[in-house]
């Protein structure tokens, strides 16, 4: 996307490979013209920057933060007691308008707590959600929530759907996103009290709600926004990550098993590299937060320079769309949607939803 924005604030001290990999990713992004401000202990960050040639000529600055949130710290307490920590300072920069968004590979709970504490929520939003972009056969479907709210009520799922629809449309450019709730079957009778209540409400919402989708539909790309509670979403995400790793190892072993397979592997290297890139979580970079008054991205704790660079790029893309302006309007009718009309015309199960089409071959 084009258009100038304020820098993206990057938590230089977040993640297993901080500050080295974080600074490297920020430098890589800055070399491509993306403005970045690194936040952390100034002397340490500048020492790391000095390792990079001509870094002083890049659109990259350093903003001091004297404290760091450790992975074992309690998120809420860390935000309140360590008021000059690098995560909170990143959010302070966003709140003041000096940064267009922030990226952190640090304590994800602290990032969520900091977002709520410093940025606050748009009017009407009950709970923010973490969004994941899935490596589907086509498109870039979103799934939320991925761990922010593990014990959900129907209002949460309804709002996740409405916020996810806005993000898909405004940030990913999907004209009319297809929205579904993750369930154990497509039939109306499937699911739980939670999913059935949310589905009944969403059938009355001004979005393209297509009903339930199953786990097998996650990566087909037939649905643009997949809604679930944070517990289920996180388990599903980790399952997909683990499956991709195991399949990759199986493929590697198979291609090394015989001379013929080794030759076949060499001949198909370009295709295999393309597939590997498609499912590489580092290409996504980070998971955006929706439901807070600012752009925030949570990156994997194992993020390397490539992941951080991509997270910065995606945060910039999101900031340019000003999608947050539409969130409050989108969730405004959510409580009314959950109310059963007095005439009883709309029941909890509602009309039969359209079935999700099988993946195109």
Swiss-Prot record:
The protein's superkingdom reads: Bacteria
Which EC number(s) are documented for this chain? Answer: 2.3.1.274
| One of the GO BP terms on file | fatty acid biosynthetic process
- Disulfide-bonded cysteine pairs: these are none
Q: In which pathway does it act?
A: Lipid metabolism; phospholipid metabolism
Q: Which reaction does it catalyse?
A: a fatty acyl-[ACP] + phosphate = an acyl phosphate + holo-[ACP]
Recorded hits in SUPFAM superfamilies, A to Z, give: Isocitrate/Isopropylmalate dehydrogenase-like
Molecular function as annotated in GO: phosphate:acyl-[acyl carrier protein] acyltransferase activity
> Which EC main class describes this enzyme?
transferase
What's in the GO CC field? cytoplasm
Instruction: Relate the assembly described in the record.
Output: Homodimer. Probably interacts with PlsY.
Per its UniProt record, what PANTHER family does this chain match? Answer: FATTY ACID/PHOSPHOLIPID SYNTHESIS PROTEIN PLSX, PHOSPHATE ACYLTRANSFERASE
- NCBIfam families per UniProt: plsX
Q: What does this protein do?
A: Catalyzes the reversible formation of acyl-phosphate (acyl-PO(4)) from acyl-[acyl-carrier-protein] (acyl-ACP). This enzyme utilizes acyl-ACP as fatty acyl donor, but not acyl-CoA.
Protein name as it appears in the record: Phosphate acyltransferase
UniProt organism field: Anaeromyxobacter dehalogenans (strain 2CP-1 / ATCC BAA-258)
Q: What is the lineage of its organism?
A: Bacteria, Pseudomonadati, Myxococcota, Myxococcia, Myxococcales
Question: What gene codes for this chain?
Answer: plsX
């Amino acid at each position: 996307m084009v258009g100038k924005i304020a820098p993206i604030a990057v938590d230089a001290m977040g993640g297993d490979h901080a500050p080295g990999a974080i600074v490297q990713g920020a430098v890589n992004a800055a070399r491509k013209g993306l403005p970045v401000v690194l936040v952390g202990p100034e002397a340490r960050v500048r020492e790391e920057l000095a390792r990079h040639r001509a870094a002083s000529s890049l659109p990259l600055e350093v903003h001091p933060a004297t404290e760091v949130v450790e992975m074992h710290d309690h998120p809420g307490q860390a935000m309140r007691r360590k008021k000059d920590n690098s995560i909170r300072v990143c959010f302070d920069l966003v709140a003041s308008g000096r940064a267009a968004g922030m990226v952190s590979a640090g304590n994800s709970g602290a990032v969520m707590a900091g977002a709520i504490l410093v940025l606050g929520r748009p009017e009407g939003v009950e709970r923010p959600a973490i969004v994941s972009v899935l490596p589907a056969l086509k498109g870039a479907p979103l799934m939320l929530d991925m761990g922010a709210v593990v014990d959900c009520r129907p209002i949460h799922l309804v709002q996740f759907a409405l916020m996810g629809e806005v993000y898909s449309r405004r940030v990913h450019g999907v004209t009319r996103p297809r929205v579904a709730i993750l369930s154990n079957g497509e039939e109306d009778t499937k699911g739980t009290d939670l999913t059935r209540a949310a589905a009944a409400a969403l059938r009355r919402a001004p979005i393209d709600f297509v009903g339930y989708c199953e786990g097998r539909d996650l990566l087909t790309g037939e649905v643009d926004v997949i809604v679930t509670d944070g517990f289920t979403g996180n388990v599903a995400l980790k399952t997909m990550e683990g499956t991709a790793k195991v399949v990759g190892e199986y493929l590697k072993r198979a291609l090394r098993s015989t001379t013929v397979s080794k030759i076949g592997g060499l001949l198909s290297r370009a295709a295999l590299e393309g597939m590997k890139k498609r499912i590489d979580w580092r290409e996504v970079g980070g998971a955006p937060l929706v439901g807070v008054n600012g752009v925030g991205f949570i990156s994997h704790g194992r993020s390397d320079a490539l992941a951080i660079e991509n997270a910065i790029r995606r945060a910039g893309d999101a900031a340019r769309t000003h999608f947050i302006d539409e969130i409050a309007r989108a969730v405004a009718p959510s409580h009314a949607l959950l109310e059963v009309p007095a005439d009883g015309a709309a029941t909890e199960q509602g009309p039969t939803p359209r079935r999700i089409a099988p993946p195109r071959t």
